Amino acid sequence: MIEKDFDLLKNDWIPCIQLDNEQRDFCIISALVNSCSIRAIHHESPVVTFSVLRFLLAFCYRVAYATKKPLTSFRNWRRVHEEWKNGIAQKDIETYLDECKCRDRFRLFDDRYPLYQVANLVCTGKEQPEPATRLFFEQFGGTPTQLWEHAPMLPTIKEAALYLISSQAFGASTSNTSKAKVGEIHYLPSGRTFAPCYKGCIVWLEGANLLETLLLNLVDYDMVDVDLPIWEKQLTIQELRARQALCKQEVNSEKKEEKCHKTFPTGPVQLFTWPSRAILLEKTKGEVVERVHFTQGLGLMDYPLDPMKPYDAEGRPMELDKNKGAWRDLHAILELKPNRNRTVLAFSHAARCGLSRTIINVAGVARGAKAAKILFWRYERFSVPVAMLEDVNIIDRIGTLVGEADNVEKILRQKAINIAYRYTVQANGRPDTKDQHDRNNDADKIAESIDPRPAYWARLEKHFFDLLQNLPNDWDTEAGDWKPDDQQHATRTWRKAVLNEARRSLEESVRSLGTTARAISAIARVGTDFSEKDLKPQPQDSQPKEKKSKPGKKGGGKNQMSLDEKRKSFIRRLLSLAEEGKEDRGALADLRSGLGKEPGKMARVHKHVVPYLPEKYRTVFLR
């Protein structure tokens, strides 16, 4: 039976997997007290998973602080770890709730203090109140645009609690949002800003059980009295109005303000429970929440220091790439920064905890050109030795080995392109009768259709996990250096796997060309083998910049070919001529004049020229 106000302290709502693999919901108190018997928080949405984890981390910080065990040093952390070794003590939780007078602040439908909401909020937009699916960032929450969106599933009260927390942690910016009021006090936001977890990716460590996971991510920091969570410092309409632009602000003004004032959180506790949205769930008589008032909350300054985010050298959160798995950037995530605040703090913290292994979780979204456009969710897990987290030699080696795989990828792609262009030439050595432009377009389409890179990277992922397990064995601890090359088993195994998977993916991709003489000839001329020299970066001469012609001068017309077009055009002409056994002095002159190269250096202009030519013609074309 669900209680009227649904108290998150007492009512079960947190989805967890226990050590016996049974799934069960817990309330806040029972989840923390029984954290030793819970394997992990688990939800189908990774955003919900890490949002609830951050919510519980903020709660644990406050419990430790209220019980005179503030996590201001690693020594205090050791003390907390010893006292909570069998689960977070319920007496500590009760002490915190009583001393901070927040026992009644965890109810979803409380009249005075609804958790994570603005009491008595009324949004006045024409679409307000919205369907409760508005809390689901990945689901329909407004006017349906697709056939399958006509009947969205409304959340239960438990689901509403989960998505209320995740919507505060994760949300995109928009130029428009609803006006709101509480009583006669009006709030006129100019638009919604990004929620704390939207930019970059969230990284957290996972232990053997929920308690270990919490303690691994409860890093020590100088906690201050004003670093308060949302349940101790309720969001009010007055605070929202104070963050509006001050120009022409009146209580009953209907004019939209130009811009809201953004602010920094006072610490991790406030950041983990940041009220980025002003929300109020409408009370329900059943077990389903139907409507919600939803508008902009407190604006957050760009790039606040988040202890669960990795940052680049310029201080910006690292984004997930739509074209790359997170494992390909693991060395950048683990990279030790000179500024400690720019690194995921749990890494150095875990290295001091005495554990042998841990699991790194990376979750976030890959976004499109438009900031609010999500291409897909990503959630990846890596089991790594704890010693690796602060070993700069191993981290650098991971970056080097992944970089070698990137080098092979470039050659792999070029081989596929070369095969596609050779395939467009008839087996008798004469070009097709169709127009040159059409033939080039056909080659481009073939190259795209046989692209072997997706299969290449997908197969390398398994080998990368093996590399993480075994790479520390390549390091000689006594000598303080890497073992001799012939004894670096993990490194040699990885490099062999890279070359084998490149060959395998290319051979499988070109099978779609068939077994005609044309296909066999194209594949044989280019080859599908890879060698160790392909692991190294390919030399590339610096290319001169294309000079823009001034209006009225020769060559300054609209049809002037770009540098890249000249290069591609010449290579295609050269390929067809080489098949016929002819030379083309005109093409050679065009290339030299167009690229500004000295005679005799044509091979450096484009590294793929010479492989197209039979041996007996190379000296002719390179004169």
Question: Could you say what each language-model-derived stretch is?
Answer:
Residues 150-153, 276:
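Residues immediately within or flanking Cys/His clusters that coordinate Zn2+
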Residues 156-159:
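Short Cys/His-rich metal-coordination motifs, predominantly Zn2+-binding knuckles/fingers
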Residues 161-164:
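Short functional micro-motifs and their immediate structural scaffolds
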